[in-house]
Amino acid sequence: MTTNDDDHAAERNTMSMNYELAATLSDEEQRARKGKAKIVCKEEDHVFIKKKEKYEEESEKREFFSHVPRKIRPALRYPQPNFENPNGASSSLNLPFEEDYYMAEYYKKTETINPPNPYHQWSPSSFLTEYTHPRMLEVLHRCGFNRPVVTCYSRTAREMRWWLRQVMKDMRAEDLTLILEKTLSTTDVITTTHGRFSMHFNRLISNDFLKPEERSILEEDTYNDETMGVGAILVDQRSQKWSVILKRWGQNYFLSCGWNDVVKANKLKAGDDICLWAFRCDGVLCFAMRQWRGILCFALVPPLTLRQSSSSNARRLC
């Protein structure tokens, strides 16, 4: 009996010791886990605090620069002297408005020096390009100015500049304008039936080469077979002069009354390329024409001189 009781007591002591050991191990394991978890939380808190400080610093920088207006870079700038602040420390807040004012004044001066011709007629064959920069279009639209138009000449027209410079130098002329680029048709060189050189309005690169009084003369005589038109003198490369008449019929200008002599003397034929230029010489409208094998020039007689002349003299030229 005593042995059995001792065995039971020893077994109970062993079990209690095992329970205590297991509890101790479990408690230590839990404490170890809690301690490691606390360390991880501290590291995460430190990283989060650093990120927060960096974000706050960047936010302060952005808020600081948000109060400073950015400089706008327009396509074109026309600087003007600042009389209010000669040291150059002008306010940047008024910069866009100052740019608009300066650019608007520039185009206003340009239009004042070279006013648009009210008689100008657009033609689909003209080579025209426009400024398309958004900043410039916005400024021009806000200030009420039309977009400037730039005429682009063809390669043939550009190659003739050297010759035109010499012609204008000899004649002391100015205001050179390209009017027409055309290939002569059969009707332009037939001397038996037509006897005229036609210039259709839709083929004109520029239709503002006539003065108002010259244009009114041609408009009054439109669809009139007995019109005198505007007298002209045609000069070829041999300095030989020919009397011609500039007329209008419908939507065409014509050179007649002497054109047949020009065709025969210069041996013009269908297929020859013609470039016609206009310029002013002492206030008189002049033209310069060049074809494949030669150079032709003619100058319009002032309309007042033509009106003073009798109709019989004009018919005699034909």
Curated annotation (Swiss-Prot):
Keyword Transcription in record? yes
- Location(s) in or outside the cell: Nucleus
Q: Where is the signal peptide?
A: none
| One GO cellular component, as annotated | nucleus
Name the keywords, alphabetized.
Answer: DNA-binding, Nucleus, Transcription, Transcription regulation
Which GO terms fall under molecular function for this chain's record?
Answer: DNA binding
| Feature: DNA-binding region | 201-293
Q: Which PROSITE patterns match?
A: B3 (PS50863)
Entry-linked InterPro entries? At2g31720-like, B3_DNA-bd, DNA-bd_pseudobarrel_sf
Q: SUPFAM superfamilies from the entry?
A: DNA-binding pseudobarrel domain
How is this protein named in the record?
B3 domain-containing protein At1g05930
